[in-house]
Structures are given as structure tokens and as C-alpha cells.
């Protein structure tokens, strides 16, 4: 018997490249916008299961929603009258890339700034309404945001209206420097004048409400509500831990933590906010 012998030749199969196209057509494609991943429980959710309120059916997490979606959930159909749309955002510091960022945010959200302001009816109650949209440069507060909210309070004083604001913000808009920081004082002064007139001011804290907005008008309401698990604070968690050199509780800066410590009056489910707003406005004199 031969010690060495040639290996048997195997049959070689050459791939038929012409079949590649036909194979790919048989592979089903899943649309990118069909599912959403819950940031809280990490489950993949069929978007239609979120409903109009955008609430996770597994853990009840409240997804961040746009100003227009919030408007649809809150006010009486056809009652919203948008105001102060002619105020244009400037670039006082000629900050590099700021104009491009603004333009992109406008195209993405359909808004001309980070807050939607106007008058509306909620179950028959007339209110002055502001809704901040975190999809617009994280709803950072610049000169236009501050001016629109200030004018809303001034209009409310003239027309004897309660003010309802849904807050959401990453803080002051750094691209406008000190001009953005002064909006904190300007809006707070308008809130005080509205209060002096004996009118009702309701704030609803949504995720996230931070920075200069928290330090000014967000916490100035006669009654402060919050959506479940909303992040609410001034400085960031890591900044605080570094400063005080202590580990903070896991639920620190969550709406429930603030309620436990007296900073929030009530946590209200998103689906119940419309009824709650109408009830509180009517109880405090109404807006008819």
C-alpha cells in the first residue's frame, strides 16, 4: 500500500452571482420607524402600541413627545390660536454653526423656536398656553423663548387668563451667552406680575426639565405637576456628586423624589393631565 497518495479532488461549486439580486428580493425588510426601544425597560415596542400618548405598555415609561403631539392631547380640538410667531432668533455672538443648527431644528420639528405659545381651550376653560419641545435644540432657552413666554404672561394679565406651561429644557442656550441667561430674570419678573394680578399659574414638568428653566419659571407655578419619572433638576448629577463628594440616591432628580421632598405637588399620568388641568383652572377662578 502506498504510503502517500494524492488527495481526492472535490467538486468545486462556483457561486452564481446572477442569483444575488433575486435572493435579496425575497428577504423581508423591516421599516426603520416600525418599532421603538423603551429607554427604561429596554423592550422593543411596536409603535402603534404606544398610542397617541406615547406610553410604554410594559413599564409605563412616558416617551418624549413633540409640542404638536402635546397640543393634540391637551386642548379642545380647533381651539388653539398660536401667538408671537413673528419673533425671529438672532445670532448676537455670531456663534459658529448656530444658524445652521437653528435651520435644521426648524426643518426637523416644524417649529420656529423651542416653545409653542398661544391661547386655547381645555374642556371649555380658556388658558394662555406654552409648550416647550425638547426636539428643538433640547428646548434650550434663548432670547426668543424668553421673549415669547414673557409676552404670554403679559397677554394673560391683559386678558385676565390663567397660564399653563409644559416645561422641558436642557437649560440656557449657550450660543447666545449672557443674553440667554438674562431670560431667567425677565420671565421670572413676568411671572411675579401675573401673580400680583391674582391670576393662576400652573406648571407641568416633563422630561427633561433642567438648568435655567428649572431655576426660573418652571418652579414658580402656584401648583406644580409632573409627569412620572421626569428628570427635573438644575445642575447635572455628576457635577453635583463631584462637588459634594457624595453618592446621590438612585432616584435623585426624578419627579417622585421631588414630590417626596415637597418640590412637586402631584405626579399625574399623561393620559389624565387634560382633566387635571381643566379641574385646577376651574377651581382657581376659571378662564372663560
Swiss-Prot record:
The keyword Transcription regulation does not apply. Binds 1 zinc ion per subunit. It comes from the Bacteria. Its main location: cytoplasm. Its cofactor is Zn(2+). One of its GO terms (biological process) is malonyl-CoA biosynthetic process. Residues 34-288 form the CoA carboxyltransferase N-terminal domain. Disulfide bonds: none annotated. Its EC number is 2.1.3.15. InterPro entries: AcCoA_carboxyl_beta (IPR034733), Acetyl_CoA_COase_Trfase_b_su (IPR000438), ClpP/crotonase-like_dom_sf (IPR029045), COA_CT_N (IPR011762). One of its GO terms (molecular function) is zinc ion binding. Keywords: ATP-binding, Cytoplasm, Fatty acid biosynthesis, Fatty acid metabolism, Lipid biosynthesis, Lipid metabolism, Metal-binding, Nucleotide-binding, Transferase, Zinc, Zinc-finger. NCBIfam families: accD. Acetyl-CoA carboxylase is a heterohexamer composed of biotin carboxyl carrier protein (AccB), biotin carboxylase (AccC) and two subunits each of ACCase subunit alpha (AccA) and ACCase subunit beta (AccD). Belongs to the AccD/PCCB family. HAMAP family: AcetylCoA_CT_beta. This is Acetyl-coenzyme A carboxylase carboxyl transferase subunit beta. The lineage of its organism: Bacteria, Bacillati, Bacillota, Bacilli, Lactobacillales. The gene is accD.
Amino acid at each position: 500500500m502506498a504510503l502517500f497518495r494524492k488527495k481526492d479532488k472535490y467538486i468545486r461549486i462556483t457561486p452564481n452571482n446572477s442569483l444575488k439580486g433575486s435572493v435579496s428580493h425575497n428577504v423581508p425588510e423591516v421599516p426603520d420607524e416600525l418599532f421603538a426601544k423603551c429607554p427604561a425597560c429596554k423592550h422593543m415596542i411596536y409603535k402603534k402600541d404606544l398610542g397617541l400618548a406615547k406610553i410604554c405598555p410594559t413599564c409605563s415609561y412616558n416617551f418624549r413627545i413633540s409640542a404638536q403631539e402635546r397640543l393634540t392631547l391637551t386642548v379642545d380640538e380647533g381651539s388653539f390660536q398660536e401667538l408671537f410667531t413673528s419673533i425671529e432668533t438672532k445670532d448676537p455672538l455670531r456663534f459658529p454653526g448656530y444658524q445652521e443648527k437653528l435651520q435644521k431644528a426648524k426643518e426637523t420639528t416644524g417649529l420656529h423656536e423651542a416653545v409653542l405659545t398661544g391661547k386655547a381651550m381645555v374642556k371649555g376653560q380658556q388658558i394662555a398656553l406654552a409648550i416647550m419641545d425638547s426636539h428643538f435644540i433640547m428646548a434650550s432657552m434663548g432670547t426668543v423663548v424668553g421673549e415669547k413666554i414673557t409676552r404670554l404672561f403679559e397677554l394673560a394679565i391683559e386678558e385676565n387668563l390663567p397660564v399653563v406651561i409644559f416645561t422641558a429644557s436642557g437649560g440656557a442656550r449657550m450660543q447666545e451667552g449672557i443674553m440667554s441667561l438674562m431670560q431667567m430674570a425677565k420671565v421670572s419678573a413676568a411671572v411675579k406680575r401675573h401673580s400680583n394680578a391674582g391670576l393662576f399659574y400652573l406648571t407641568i414638568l416633563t422630561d427633561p426639565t433642567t438648568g435655567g428653566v428649572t431655576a426660573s419659571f418652571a418652579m414658580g407655578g402656584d401648583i406644580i405637576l409632573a409627569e412620572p419619572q421626569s428628570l427635573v433638576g438644575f445642575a447635572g448629577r455628576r457635577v453635583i456628586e463631584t462637588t459634594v463628594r457624595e453618592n446621590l440616591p438612585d432616584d435623585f432628580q426624578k419627579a417622585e423624589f421631588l414630590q417626596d421632598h415637597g418640590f412637586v405637588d402631584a405626579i399625574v399620568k399623561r393620559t389624565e393631565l387634560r382633566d387635571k388641568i381643566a379641574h385646577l383652572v376651574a377651581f382657581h377662578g376659571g378662564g372663560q
